């Protein structure tokens, strides 16, 4: 059996009508995941509803209500293969709530395709998505300039959209020289799998070929062990078994570990994945591990396991770069929403608004602003209302990102810049 191809999570991001779902549907069709007869069924249904161009999008939007509205709501996971990688597509809705899923889900994307319409170019929302992608740790992107069929495959229109997107991604910190810009028509199939005769002026890779140019993200095995707990079980005859995903470092049998903020220690007796025992677990592995020396009630979801000599950091307070996505009024000092970070959900208070930033350049716009509103980016000091493990995004990005939830929506997202550690006795 050939060794499994490396796996990558791919986010597909874009403004609501720029053809994101259609692009994903087309990729799944061209890679053989979705067969023609299924598509024909979707096509008939789409035509009967007067949405003839939506058949590929319907592959992703398989929920009935979404189909009738023609927009993507929940994140759908679909898998496909290229010669080099196994991809899981995280079809990110052009709606606001995908941010929470992007940060806290297993859907932490390694790379992204940004779909922008050749007829309209980047929109305000495109900026926000690109900025967020960078904020959330996506470092590799492809820009797909879609709907080329609607502009008669005009090189001029392509260049117009490309120039605008070049400026936009540069302002956020992506390097245009390392970013493929590809003219496509997801609906007609141009430059998805085969080079299109309609764009003889374009000499670069097709979309599927460009996906194989992505570099595999580094496995953070050299970092200290950090394993956020999802659940804790008691198994008779075995004992206490915490379950979670290794984010960084290596979990080893026989290792002495500590759980924070619970502040308890134990020793790893055994490690299990898919009902098989393993001597160690690496980043990305979802494991159950039996720990000697702790009882079920000692540890809970949201705790983080680390080596006894380098335990996870419990924050007294932390400073973070925060982007406000949506808020019905304004956000000011004293605001205490719920922060979702790794598996933890903890109410935290904004105790200081230090600097307001220009979201496009990152430059300081205002010192100590009185409030923040939707669309603002800022550096803030935040105090958890109860002990919380959080690390700096620079050292351990997997534990340094968070989503801020309130009133049933994601109001903000951010990255931890520094942590003032709480002394644990």
UniProtKB/Swiss-Prot annotation:
Positions of region (G1): 14-21
Positions of the UniProt region annotated as G5: 185-187
Cysteines joined through disulfide linkages: none
Enzyme kind, highest EC tier: hydrolase
Record's keyword terms, sorted: Cytoplasm, Elongation factor, GTP-binding, Hydrolase, Magnesium, Metal-binding, Nucleotide-binding, Protein biosynthesis
Pfam families tied to this protein: GTP-eEF1A_C (PF22594), GTP_EFTU (PF00009), GTP_EFTU_D2 (PF03144)
Name of this chain's protein: Elongation factor 1-alpha
Organism: Methanocorpusculum labreanum (strain ATCC 43576 / DSM 4855 / Z)
